[in-house]
Curated annotation (Swiss-Prot):
PTM description: Can be phosphorylated by DYRK2 (in vitro). Dephosphorylated by calcineurin in a Ca(2+) dependent manner, and probably by PP2A or PP4 serine phosphatases in cAMP- and PKC-mediated pathways.
Modified positions (N-acetylserine) in chain numbering: 2
Gene3D superfamilies linked: Nucleic acid-binding proteins (2.40.50.140)
Protein purpose: Binds mRNA and regulates the stability of target mRNA.
GO cellular component: cytoplasm; cytoplasmic exosome (RNase complex); cytosol; P granule; P-body
Annotated segments matching region Disordered: 1-49
SUBUNIT field: Homodimer. Interacts with STYX.
Sequence positions bearing Phosphothreonine: 45
GN (gene name): Carhsp1
Annotated compartments: Cytoplasm; Cytoplasm, P-body; Cytoplasmic granule
Protein name: Calcium-regulated heat stable protein 1
GO annotation (BP), single: regulation of mRNA stability
Taxonomic source organism: Rattus norvegicus
A Pfam entry, by short name: CSD
C-alpha cells in the first residue's frame, strides 16, 4: 500500500480522445416560426386587424380599381385605383368571393391605413366585379375556368 494519493486526472490532449471527431451529433434546435418558408406578415391581415380599424374601414367609401398584380403563393398584390394615385396593397385575406384575382380584374374595395405610422393604405373588403377577359381564373379551391 502506498500512502501517495493518486495523480489528478489530466485533460485530454487530442480531440479524438474525448470523442469530438468520432461521433457527429445533430444540433438540437428550438422550433422557429420562420422554418418552412412561413414568414409572418408585417401588415395587419383580416385576422390581426383591430376591431376599431375594421369598423373604420367598413364605414369608409367604396373605391374602384383594377388588379395590377397578385401572387397567390406570396399572398399579396396591388390594385391600381381608377381615379389615379399610388397603387394600393392587397392582402390575400381581404379578397371576398370565390376567385383569385389576376391582372386586369376590375375590383371594388375600401381602404384601411397600415400601422404603425398610418402613412400607407391597404385595400380591404375587395370584391372582383368583372373578370379580366381572355384570362384563366382559379378558384380558391383550385378549379380553373376561362373568362
Amino acid at each position: 500500500m502506498s500512502s501517495e494519493p493518486p495523480p489528478p486526472p489530466q485533460p485530454p490532449t487530442h480531440q479524438t480522445s474525448i470523442g469530438l471527431l468520432d461521433t457527429p451529433r445533430a444540433r438540437d434546435r428550438s422550433p422557429s416560426p420562420l422554418r418552412g418558408n412561413v414568414v409572418p406578415s408585417p401588415l395587419p391581415t383580416r385576422r390581426t386587424r383591430t376591431f376599431s380599424a375594421t369598423v373604420r374601414a367598413s364605414q369608409g367609401p367604396v373605391y374602384k380599381g383594377v388588379c395590377k398584380c397578385f401572387c397567390r403563393s406570396k399572398g399579396h398584390g396591388f390594385i391600381t385605383p381608377a381615379d389615379g394615385g399610388p397603387d394600393i396593397f392587397l392582402h390575400i385575406s381581404d379578397v371576398e368571393g370565390e376567385y383569385v384575382p389576376v391582372e386586369g380584374d376590375e375590383v371594388t374595395y375600401k381602404m384601411c391605413s397600415i400601422p404603425p405610422k398610418n402613412e400607407k393604405l391597404q385595400a380591404v373588403e375587395v370584391v372582383i366585379t368583372h373578370l379580366a377577359p381572355g384570362t384563366k381564373h382559379e378558384t380558391w379551391s383550385g378549379h380553373v375556368i376561362s373568362s
